[in-house]
């Protein structure tokens, strides 16, 4: 094809993704679009739905490799090339969405006709607006008995500020309104800009590891053209590779002769190591490189850290390989080796949020069959020392000596909670118990309220979402983003077993709650840790000061069983002998700490914060 033909073809390309709150019908709509454009035959559709979707539902990972090319013949008789870029995985927190949106010009916003706008809908819309995308509102599930499309239309206009007068009323399940959606994509989503004749530039928005072909990049071509035999170069590290294959997904991988400006597809170039490619990097040609990198999606910094240790220590190398493979698809996962006296060798991992942490843990256990121990998640604190240094600390065991600390700052998030009016009291009570500061409250409609709080991230990290759901009978939806660092009265609490610090049980706590929290943890550990042959004191300490203590009584054999009657001094001698043995045992004995003990430090019953 000459450049004239390629430019004509480019005008027919439409790149879009579907954004929606969970369960508003994103996947069903994607399936209907695949069916309507005859990308997948109805026979395969059934199989694909069952296979990929179950997996995606269950594990929160993407369908195959998530950019699908469709051909659609519009009412004007022209055939258009659509690229549906599925927002990967759960869109529970926005970290994955941003990279899909960076490859699009338009987004279909799906809103449930019965439930209306939810917190994550808003978060994703703002992301799409930041990327200057054309947003097409679709009000889905209009065939539900509780559907109220007009109310939702007003919500979209009032809350988001989008013109919803032309919003498509659809039911993905029943196949209503699908054609209208496709026509709107043709009319309203702009064709990709970019120049076929310019030096080749492509944005990597995902990648996957194939045991035979190495790392396969998923790219959006911004300028120029790429074909097998070209030598490509990564702009972040200058490494070069020979392209062996390019192609598109339909959802199966289909090889092509070339990929040109505006295309979304894959590039295989025998890239062996995971570290050579990063999502968000720019690819160009080695012999005619582009002048500058694309401003891709921004690198996200981890907000939550936790230690991951294999239960069987000989699985350490397997765990490293598994983390490297996961990191390939997930540029935001960070890890570095660490050792713990209690748990042996493992890794300190950084995650973007709790959902991210759960998904990674689940994938490690399922896909790689590694049994893990996770330590308590913690956040990044800014510790200012007396010699005017600022240290970033994400692991409680790295906290400097309390005498060197001038003050500590902790991250706060802006939490947006949407909830029916009757539960506003419960939400405010929970947020205040978690040291939240009230910011504002808006009514979305007669019944639903958007409450905004500033809450320390450390208070959200563990079970805030579960508590929120249970106190609002599951009606609340919640989203948060980083706000700022603030000074706080924080202290590090150590747990001592038999006089020894257990590094994996240390945690950071607000001074106000330290005493109660120490007391509760000590009592919990007393119930969980099995009794030993000797007495074990459990202590909670801040610096040198012990704030709580509880003892696990020793198991003891009845050494007097064989003394029938007899002299009291004989009995005393046996008891003294037992006591000396216990004392010796205590001096050298170490205490086995079961996995539940690490988790119990986390699941603080809420009565600690009343």
Curated annotation (Swiss-Prot):
Its EC number is 3.6.5.n1. It comes from the Bacteria. Required for accurate and efficient protein synthesis under certain stress conditions. May act as a fidelity factor of the translation reaction, by catalyzing a one-codon backward translocation of tRNAs on improperly translocated ribosomes. Back-translocation proceeds from a post-translocation (POST) complex to a pre-translocation (PRE) complex, thus giving elongation factor G a second chance to translocate the tRNAs correctly. Binds to ribosomes in a GTP-dependent manner. It is found in: Cell membrane. Its main location: membrane. It catalyses: GTP + H2O = GDP + phosphate + H(+). Residues 11-193 form the tr-type G domain. Keywords: Cell membrane, GTP-binding, Hydrolase, Membrane, Nucleotide-binding, Protein biosynthesis. GTP binds at residues 23-28, 140-143. GO terms for cellular component: plasma membrane. Pfam families: EFG_C, EFG_III, GTP_EFTU, GTP_EFTU_D2, LepA_C. Belongs to the TRAFAC class translation factor GTPase superfamily. Classic translation factor GTPase family. LepA subfamily. This is Elongation factor 4. One of its GO terms (biological process) is positive regulation of translation. InterPro entries: EF-4, EFG_II, EFG_III/V, EFG_V-like, EFTu-like_2, G_TR_CS, LepA_C_sf, LepA_CTD. It is a peripheral membrane protein. GO terms for molecular function: GTP binding; GTPase activity; ribosome binding; translation elongation factor activity. PANTHER family: TRANSLATION FACTOR GUF1 HOMOLOG, CHLOROPLASTIC, TRANSLATION FACTOR GUF1-RELATED. The gene is lepA.
